[in-house]
């Protein structure tokens, strides 16, 4: 007799829901409306972003697309550089050895408690950090790690806060504020008064508000309670002295001062500064990771864990773009290994599509990605899978299967393989139909889907609602 209201992006939960409320149409200021209210079956027919993905009109990754810029899987060849980890036995890991191909998207999969985080966070990451002379805790028990010389660095991109100061914001994090300060320094009034770009810094210099030091807030320590940030009473949160705010630049039909620019969302800024190449180049990585709804001056401590993780990714994209532009080489001689722990948590289908495009940018210039992931769109699009299990806890810690997604999909005892097969049926993905054409006819798909769901248990969907939707999809 209870009622459940769930914020969810997993299609299995959506299919099982009795009622769907779809918010949008866009993120941030472009959202805040109910764009659909009804059943999941009706949502699939509705022309909303969520409906487009649930119905298959849009796909997070179209593996068969030949369009320029489309995701492409990278084959693992015999000469592909690899990391070799031998004898990992930390916590429940059962003396496992594995090869990890580099310059590829590698997903570590498996049920909860199967040893994924232990493998990445307790063994692999500390061992690599120690190899590069970085401060880290002692690596978990293992025999040896080989192949790290193929890399120039390793970065673990987690959801921890980027910083604790309110002065740090998305614009400064990716280097866009430097370019914007240069624009203000060229304004007629700034040149008349002799203001340089440094005058428009909120981190240093005498142009910032002397009361709050350029943060726009006063920090009040509450001892045993969470600290409180109060809007600065002198600058009213605008960060700068009044005379600095008199300097304006004209963009489109707006005359903007520095405080006005910091209040722009990234989406608004890319439109207003479309003709300013340096600003646009610096902001583009934030757009690429799907954070164009945040404000340029939003303090980074106020970002969620997922937003902080994506902003870190945007920072690496910006850094990679600058390095590539300076060296004029499209491919890094020794790439960086990026480690992610469930980066799709809390993301919509469309956000995941943007995230995958950002991943592709890193791969295209020679970097490597290892991702702990449960999202089936990401798993099926990866270049290599390492499936842990078979169960959790003491019944896990083994490598059930490793290889391409197609290899794992066909593995008889892999929960991930079973989930991939089930997902292909539910979403009407061609790969399942192609591998079953000779032994399954179209009228038997609903029966096949029912059998898969019975066998999977908690691996994918267990309610009757997805089954009814599957039948409606495949029965005449």
Spans of model-derived segments:
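Conserved phosphate-binding elements of NTP-dependent enzyme cores
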Residues: 1-436, 448, 466-476
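Arg/Gly-rich low-complexity intrinsically disordered repeat tracts
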Residues: 440-460, 468-471
């Amino acid at each position: 007799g209870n009622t459940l209201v769930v914020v969810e992006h997993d299609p299995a939960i959506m299919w099982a829901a009795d009622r769907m409320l779809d918010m949008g149409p866009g993120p941030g200021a472009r959202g805040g409306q109910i764009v659909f209210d009804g059943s999941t079956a009706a949502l699939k027919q509705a022309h909303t972003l969520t409906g487009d993905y649930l119905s298959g009109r849009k796909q997070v990754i179209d593996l068969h697309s030949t369009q320029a810029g489309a995701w492409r899987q990278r084959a693992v060849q015999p000469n592909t550089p690899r990391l070799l980890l031998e004898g990992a036995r930390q916590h429940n890991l059962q003396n496992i050895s594995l090869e990890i191909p580099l310059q590829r998207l590698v997903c570590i999969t498996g049920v909860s408690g199967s040893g994924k985080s232990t493998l990445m966070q307790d063994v692999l990451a500390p061992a690599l950090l120690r190899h590069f002379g970085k401060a880290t805790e002692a690596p978990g028990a293992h025999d040896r790690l080989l192949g790290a010389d193929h890399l120039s660095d390793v970065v673990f991109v987690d959801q921890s806060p980027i910083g604790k100061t309110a002065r740090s914001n998305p614009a400064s994090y990716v280097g866009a504020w430097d370019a914007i300060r240069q624009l203000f320094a060229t304004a007629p009034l700034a040149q008349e008064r002799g203001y340089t770009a440094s005058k428009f810094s909120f981190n240093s210099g005498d142009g910032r508000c002397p009361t709050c030091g350029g943060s726009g807030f006063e920090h009040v320590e509450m001892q045993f309670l969470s600290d409180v940030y109060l809007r600065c009473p002198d600058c009213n949160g605008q960060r700068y002295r009044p005379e600095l705010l008199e300097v304006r630049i004209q963009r489109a039909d707006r005359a903007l001062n520095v405080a006005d620019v910091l209040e722009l969302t990234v989406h608004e800024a890319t439109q207003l500064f479309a003709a300013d190449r340096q600003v646009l180049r610096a902001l583009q990585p934030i757009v690429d990771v799907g954070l164009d709804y945040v404000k340029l001056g939003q303090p980074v401590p106020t970002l969620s864990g997922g937003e902080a993780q994506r902003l870190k990714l945007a920072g690496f994209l910006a850094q990679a773009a600058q390095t590539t532009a300076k060296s004029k080489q499209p491919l890094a001689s020794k790439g960086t290994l990026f480690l992610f722990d469930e980066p799709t948590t809390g993301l919509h289908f469309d956000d995941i599509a943007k995230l995958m495009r950002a991943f592709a940018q890193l791969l295209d210039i020679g970097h490597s990605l290892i991702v702990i992931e449960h999202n089936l769109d990401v798993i099926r699009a990866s270049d290599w899978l390492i499936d842990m299990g078979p169960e959790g806890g003491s019944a896990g810690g083994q490598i059930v299967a490793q290889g391409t997604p197609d290899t794992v999909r066909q593995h008889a005892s892999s929960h991930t393989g079973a989930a991939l097969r089930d997902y292909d049926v539910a979403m009407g993905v061609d790969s399942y139909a192609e591998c079953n054409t000779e032994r399954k006819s179209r009228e038997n798909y609903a029966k096949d889907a029912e059998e898969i769901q019975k066998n999977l248990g908690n691996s994918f969907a267990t309610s009757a609602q997805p089954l009814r939707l599957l039948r409606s999809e495949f029965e005449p």
